[in-house]
Amino acid sequence: MNNTFRYLNGYAMQYGLFLGVWYILVSAAYVGSFAMPILSSFCFFLFLSIPFLIALLTARFRSLVEGEFSFNKGFSFAFLTSLYACVWQALAVYIYLAYIDNGFVFDSFQASLERPEVKEELERSGIMPQIMEITNGGGIESLVDGLRMITPATYTAVIIYFNFIIAPVLSAFVALTLKRRKREVR
């Protein structure tokens, strides 16, 4: 049992690095989408492809395992792969926000919210009054200033927490889809 887990964990670490690079690409496309709006479509595509990529990586691991590939093995592998990927993404986001960004993300976010068509849509949908209420009348600038006050470590923690909520659900679907029963010998 211990060797089986080490084998599974070793491959989860390797594939987690690959998936982590994918997560980092999603984050980079999101940041880049403020300067180049076409990247928002690319970011959306990359984000939606994550469950399929996890399933593909788990299927590749399953092909290396002889005999039964139980739900538990599939779940453990998919969950650990997601966990290791999340660590890489969290590290990259922390380094970016703490040392590289210099306020670009928040300045770009504020600029996009202050565009006339966006302001009009915020008013029409009833979100602007909520922003005014949350910020005690400060508006968009006050909202973005509040986001700036959050430390890079907190954004990193949010990424990890989000992963701990989503990864078990994705892992369960992947494990159910890819489980393989032992074939009976006649």
Predicted regions and their residues:
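Hydrophobic alpha-helical transmembrane segments
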Residues: 17-32, 97-117, 156-157
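Alpha-helical transmembrane segments of multipass membrane proteins
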Residues: 18, 22-26, 30, 85-93, ...
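Alpha-helical transmembrane segments with an aromatic anchor "belt"
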Residues: 64-83
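C-terminal halves and exits of single transmembrane alpha-helices
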Residues: 80-103
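Transmembrane alpha-helical segments in integral membrane proteins
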Residues: 145-182
